[in-house]
Amino acid sequence: MSKEGLPTPKDVSGKGLRVAVVTATWNAEICDQLHRRALETAEAAGAIVTPLRVVGALELPVVVQAAARTHDAVVALGCVVRGGTPHFDYVCDSVTQGLTRIALDESTPVANGVLTVNDYEQAVDRAGFADSAEDKGAEAMQAALETVHTLRTLDESNLK
């Protein structure tokens, strides 16, 4: 798996930031690892974290929206593995559109860390295990924290 194009993470402080991590429970081994890595990244940055769980990916948007109203950022995590029916496409499209709409409607960063993979092996390779090529839980948290700082920079520049 290529990491080509992956941006270098900025050293951002999460001090004083309230961040929710909303994680689905389907594909528990993968989702638990994504959740753990997001929490570790937030705590290392000094953020105040609210961990939340939902059953599946389709339940993410409604809880993410509620969290977006009371937090500085939200990270949505889950794992959808392609099966033999179009259900995969419906779930992935609905979740992606829902999370994007929430971020725009609430003006709150929502990092989409929902893995959409062809097989379980691809999920393991992205979940941030010791032998994984990628760490999508940590990357989603990093993106959320950086986006909060970018929005605050915009707010400050509008005050001048």
Swiss-Prot record:
Q: What does the UniProt function comment say about this protein? A: Catalyzes the formation of 6,7-dimethyl-8-ribityllumazine by condensation of 5-amino-6-(D-ribitylamino)uracil with 3,4-dihydroxy-2-butanone 4-phosphate. This is the penultimate step in the biosynthesis of riboflavin.
What biological processes does GO assign it? riboflavin biosynthetic process
Which is an annotated GO molecular function term of this record?
Answer: 6,7-dimethyl-8-ribityllumazine synthase activity
Q: What is the lineage of its organism?
A: Bacteria, Bacillati, Actinomycetota, Actinomycetes, Mycobacteriales
Matching entries from PANTHER family are given as:
6,7-DIMETHYL-8-RIBITYLLUMAZINE SYNTHASE, 6,7-DIMETHYL-8-RIBITYLLUMAZINE SYNTHASE DMRL SYNTHASE LUMAZINE SYNTHASE
Top EC category? transferase
Query: What catalytic activity is recorded?
Result: (2S)-2-hydroxy-3-oxobutyl phosphate + 5-amino-6-(D-ribitylamino)uracil = 6,7-dimethyl-8-(1-D-ribityl)lumazine + phosphate + 2 H2O + H(+)
UniProt keyword annotation of Transmembrane helix present: no
Provide the family line.
Belongs to the DMRL synthase family.
Claim: Transferase is one of the keywords in the record: yes
Enumerate the residues binding 5-amino-6-(D-ribitylamino)uracil: 26, 57-59, 79-81, 112
List the pathway annotation.
Answer: Cofactor biosynthesis; riboflavin biosynthesis; riboflavin from 2-hydroxy-3-oxobutyl phosphate and 5-amino-6-(D-ribitylamino)uracil: step 1/2
The entry marks the following residues as binding (2S)-2-hydroxy-3-oxobutyl phosphate, namely 84-85, 126
Gene that this polypeptide is encoded by: ribH
| Catalytic residues (positions) | 87 (proton donor)
**What GO cellular component is one of the record's annotations?**
riboflavin synthase complex
Keyword list (alphabetical) reads:
Riboflavin biosynthesis, Transferase
Q: What is this protein called?
A: 6,7-dimethyl-8-ribityllumazine synthase
Please give the Pfam families that the UniProt record associates with this protein: DMRL_synthase
Stated EC number for the protein is: 2.5.1.78
Entries under InterPro entries matching the protein: LS, LS/RS, LS/RS_sf
The organism encoding this protein is Corynebacterium aurimucosum (strain ATCC 700975 / DSM 44827 / CIP 107346 / CN-1)
